[in-house]
């Protein structure tokens, strides 16, 4: 889904990670935050919006559970896309002494502390 979405906007992803965004207030929906590093430095907001819409559509099409949670505002809002400059993930991995060797950027981060650390490093402050 991520690659298809990048192809739609003519961009190439070098790294990405996704984690959950918990509701902050009563009645809010949760969702997922995709932190994405493109090889290109000129990805526009319009392209990011298209990337997010395509990603959401691909996930709905290919994942019945996701589709059920996205239907009629039940449980999940559309994915939030946060793009970061090239080299951002390498800097984060280096900061954690995880750059190189067998270490890879985790794609799906279920550890809330680790995801909070990544968001903080990348400059994304919301839950």
Q: Where are these predicted regions, by residue range?
A:
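AMP-binding adenylation
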Residues: 1-127
């Amino acid at each position: 889904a991520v690659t298809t979405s990048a192809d739609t906007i003519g961009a190439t992803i070098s790294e990405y990670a996704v984690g959950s965004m918990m509701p902050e207030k009563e009645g809010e929906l949760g969702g997922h935050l995709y932190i994405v590093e493109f090889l290109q430095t000129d990805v526009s907001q319009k392209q990011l919006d298209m990337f997010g819409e395509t990603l959401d559509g691909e996930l709905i099409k290919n994942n019945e559970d996701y589709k059920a949670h996205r239907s009629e505002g039940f449980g999940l809002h559309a994915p939030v896309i946060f793009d970061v400059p090239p080299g951002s993930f390498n800097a984060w991995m280096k900061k954690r002494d995880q750059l190189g060797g067998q270490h890879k950027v985790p794609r799906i981060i279920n550890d809330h502390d680790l995801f909070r650390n990544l968001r903080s490093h990348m400059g994304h402050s919301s839950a």
